[in-house]
């Protein structure tokens, strides 16, 4: 620092020679200025450095807090992305499960419908057979009542069977 000041002041000494003219007190003024500037710098340097350092620390603190917020937001973003991926996997498994359940339910409904149809057909066949037997029984009973009601008609067994077969058939 002293060398810089000396180099700065050296040209003043070189040009400050007297020419036999008016005596200017440039050297004294320059020395007074340098001395004043040096004292001023001595007293103000530490507060200026402290002020500058506090500003640097303040900016560094803000930068650190911003970086911390950025890290936290990145963590939240990563967590949200993980949850989205889990939700996608969960949704696809739910869709697959729903499809399987729908297929199983459709098969069960089809099987139940087939069983119900078979039961209805069996019931219809049984009812039809019952009605045929009932009708046959009524016809035979009617014929027999007609035959036994009339005394004049004497029929042997073969004729009776033929008559019944004609009525039924």
UniProtKB/Swiss-Prot annotation:
Bilayer topology: Single-pass membrane protein
UniProt keyword terms in alphabetical order: ATP synthesis, Cell inner membrane, Cell membrane, CF(0), Hydrogen ion transport, Ion transport, Membrane, Transmembrane, Transmembrane helix, Transport
Membrane-spanning intervals of the chain: 3-23
Keyword Ion transport applies: yes
Localization annotation: Cell inner membrane
UniProt keyword Translocase present: no
Origin superkingdom: Bacteria
A single GO molecular function term of this UniProt record: proton-transporting ATP synthase activity, rotational mechanism
InterPro entries: ATP_synth_b/b'su_bac/chlpt
GO cellular component: plasma membrane; proton-transporting ATP synthase complex
Family: Belongs to the ATPase B chain family.
Record's function text: F(1)F(0) ATP synthase produces ATP from ADP in the presence of a proton or sodium gradient. F-type ATPases consist of two structural domains, F(1) containing the extramembraneous catalytic core and F(0) containing the membrane proton channel, linked together by a central stalk and a peripheral stalk. During catalysis, ATP synthesis in the catalytic domain of F(1) is coupled via a rotary mechanism of the central stalk subunits to proton translocation. Component of the F(0) channel, it forms part of the peripheral stalk, linking F(1) to F(0).
Quaternary assembly: F-type ATPases have 2 components, F(1) - the catalytic core - and F(0) - the membrane proton channel. F(1) has five subunits: alpha(3), beta(3), gamma(1), delta(1), epsilon(1). F(0) has three main subunits: a(1), b(2) and c(10-14). The alpha and beta chains form an alternating ring which encloses part of the gamma chain. F(1) is attached to F(0) by a central stalk formed by the gamma and epsilon chains, while a peripheral stalk is formed by the delta and b chains.
Protein known as: ATP synthase subunit b
Organism: Campylobacter curvus (strain 525.92)
């Amino acid at each position: 620092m002293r060398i810089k000041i000396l180099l700065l002041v050296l040209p003043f000494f070189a040009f400050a020679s007297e020419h036999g003219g008016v005596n200017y007190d440039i050297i004294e003024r320059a020395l007074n200025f340098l001395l004043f500037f040096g004292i001023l710098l001595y007293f103000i340097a530490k507060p200026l450095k402290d002020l500058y350092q506090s500003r640097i620390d303040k900016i560094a603190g803000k930068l650190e807090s911003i970086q911390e917020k950025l890290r936290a937001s990145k963590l939240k973003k990563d967590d949200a992305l993980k949850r989205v991926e889990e939700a996608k996997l969960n949704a696809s498994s739910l869709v697959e499960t729903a499809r399987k359940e729908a297929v199983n339910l459709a098969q069960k409904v089809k099987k139940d419908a087939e069983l119900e149809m078979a039961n209805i057909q069996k019931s219809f066949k049984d009812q039809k057979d019952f009605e045929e037997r009932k009708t046959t029984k009524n016809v035979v009973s009617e014929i027999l009542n007609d035959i036994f009601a009339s005394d004049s008609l004497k029929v042997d067994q073969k004729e009776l069977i033929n008559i019944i077969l004609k009525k039924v058939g």
